[in-house]
């Protein structure tokens, strides 16, 4: 039997034809090549399947799975996690871009710091054309060696996309994964933070695309409630959960039993003026 690649990349997607090919080019062109890319197509109705099949024929590292029906946003994210075979895992989006050395820098950081559970990098927002519009600031003390400090900071000090970092698969699987509510990634971030410190690579290597169709914390703040859980009729159930409720779910005993006690310029974009 062929040995599993060390890293599994999960890419859940629904109707992603506008940006998917560009994102796949950035992932498949990484300097770190020892990975399998698992794409879960959530019953897309556009050209997503054709794009995946085309790239799958060109690169054997791609494993394409099409869901027979739409299973919902968060269940599709959880599905790619269940398919992970590597000791490391990274979640990706079909519309984002990645600098060529992103994976290598994060994997190297995990190798150099065995106590770290996630390695991520500085992040920038890009527009629909791939131009950098904003360099994001990180305020969360996720690198603290003290679990209580990490926990407090994640609840109170900010929002960072650590769930898009490279993480240890066994640690991720000790969490409850993504719930069907807004800020589910913040919940899982906090669970991961209880298990160990995070490492931030001090370079802008991850480029998040901001566009009208994107489901993100930014759309929540402008009053948009997306449909995240599949219902009996195949439609979704709209759920909005505030930060306080999400944080409360983490602090309940059922959420902490799984956690051990504590022991630039883009290749495709341009910098904004100023």
What name fits each language-model region?
Residues 89:
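Short aromatic/hydrophobic "clamp" motif used to bind/position activated sugar donors
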Residues 101-135:
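Conserved donor NDP-sugar-binding/catalytic core segment of glycosyltransferases
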Residues 67-84, 97:
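Glycine-rich, basic loop-to-helix element that forms the pyrophosphate-binding segment
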Residues 9, 82, 99, 143-222:
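Conserved nucleotide-sugar donor-binding catalytic segment
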Residues 15-29:
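Short, well-formed alpha-helical segments that are part of the catalytic scaffolds
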Residues 21, 46-54, 101:
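Acidic helix N-cap motif at the loop->helix transition within catalytic regions
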Residues 41-50, 69, 93:
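A conserved acidic beta->alpha catalytic loop
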Residues 4-7, 28-39, 47, 60-63:
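Short loop->beta transition adjacent to catalytic acidic/histidine clusters or analogous donor-positioning motifs
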């Amino acid at each position: 039997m062929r040995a599993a690649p060390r890293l599994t990349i999960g890419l859940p997607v629904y109707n992603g034809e506008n940006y998917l090919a560009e994102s796949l080019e950035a992932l498949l062109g990484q300097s770190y090549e020892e990975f399998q890319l698992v794409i879960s197509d959530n019953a897309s109705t556009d050209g997503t399947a054709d794009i995946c099949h085309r790239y799958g024929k060109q690169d054997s590292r791609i494993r394409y799975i099409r869901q027979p029906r739409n299973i919902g946003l968060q269940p599709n994210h959880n599905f790619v996690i269940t398919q992970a075979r590597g000791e490391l895992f990274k979640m990706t989006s079909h519309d984002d871009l990645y600098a060529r050395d992103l994976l290598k820098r994060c994997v190297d950081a995990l190798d150099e710091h065995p106590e770290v559970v996630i390695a991520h990098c500085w992040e920038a927002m890009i527009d629909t054309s791939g131009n950098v519009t904003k360099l994001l600031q990180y305020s969360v003390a996720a690198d603290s060696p003290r679990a209580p400090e990490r926990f407090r900071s994640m609840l109170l000090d900010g929002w960072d996309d650590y769930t898009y970092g490279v993480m240890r698969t066994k640690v991720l699987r000790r969490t409850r994964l993504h719930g069907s509510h807004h800020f589910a990634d913040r919940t899982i971030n906090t669970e991961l933070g209880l298990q160990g410190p995070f490492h931030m690579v001090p370079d802008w290597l991850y480029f998040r695309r901001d566009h009208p169709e994107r489901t993100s914390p930014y759309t929540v703040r402008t009053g948009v409630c997306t449909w995240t859980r599949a219902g009996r009729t195949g439609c979704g159930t709209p759920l909005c959960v505030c930060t306080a409720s999400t944080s409360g779910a983490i602090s309940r005993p059922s959420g902490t039993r799984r956690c051990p006690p504590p022991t630039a310029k883009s290749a495709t974009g341009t910098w904004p003026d100023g």
